Amino acid sequence: MRLIVYNIRYATGTGPTFHLPVPGSGYLRSSPRALHGIAEFIRGQDPDIVGLVEVDTGSIRSGMINQAEFIAHSIGHYSIHECKYGVRSFNQRIPVLRKQSNAFLSAPRVHGERFHYFTTGIKRLIIELELSEVCVFLVHLSLKYRQRQEQLRFMHDLIQKSSKPVVVAGDFNTFWGTDEIYLFMRATGLRSANAQGLPSYPARVPRAELDFVLVDPRIRVEHFAIPDVRWSDHRPLVCDFSVIPGGSP
């Protein structure tokens, strides 16, 4: 099974013009070229599952285009998506922010999906995608260290409830890489598919390991790569894995 995890930064593109006329102004405009480039890259990888972080699901910024559905249609998948903020968050009332989402794209072999929410942080959404043999969770953790640790504790309790092998993936915002999630991995038994600790951010010259695919002991990682793709400020993660028959590592 092939999983792609990609923080696409709302398909706003990259480069020096992103910060013109003022720093960060690029967040207010999307790039059709970037969106088509992201879709073309994903289609070329022929994934079974795609976890997208920072997706615009139809605000004025994206020209009212639901980026999750656009990419899903281009690869023949279906999409599930939800606003990344808490259900009662004030951000749910702000036109552009309420369309800032995370999404799963998947082939039809899905048994169900669930939305969970962290109790701390601004970005609270957890998407759980249940397949026949595995459960995959998509997260975007807080920029604040203490809140990230509280969110990881919440994730620990959540994945303990799963009877199936688990994958936890997404943008962890871990500025110290795997060192920051060492105790979480020890407590859950998960390990990083990125055995070499390759960085994924920033896309142009990666220095930080912010994005992760963490896998259950009952899962075999067959291939892992971080392609040199620069449609976003993050590079994508590509992970091929299989569930070990009988459930023993």
Region roles according to the model:
Residues 1-4, 12, 106-111, 122-138, ...:
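Beta-strand-turn-beta hairpins that frame and shape the catalytic cleft
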Residues 1-74, 81-89, 245-249:
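N-terminal, active-site-proximal structural segment of metallo-dependent hydrolase catalytic domains
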Residues 7-8, 55, 141, 171-172, ...:
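Active-site metal-binding loops of divalent metal-dependent hydrolases
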Residues 13-19, 64-65, 91-94, 126, ...:
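Short aromatic-enriched loop/helix-cap "lid" or pocket-rim segments at secondary-structure transitions
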Residues 25-31, 116-117, 142-146:
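Short, flexible loop segments at the rims of nucleotide/cofactor-binding pockets, characterized by
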Residues 29-37, 63, 121, 147-154, ...:
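Soluble or luminal CAZymes and related metallo-dependent hydrolases
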Residues 54-133, 225-228:
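Structured beta-strand-rich core segments of catalytic domains in phosphoester-bond hydrolases
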Residues 110, 115-117, 130, 147-150, ...:
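Metal-dependent phosphoester-hydrolase catalytic domains
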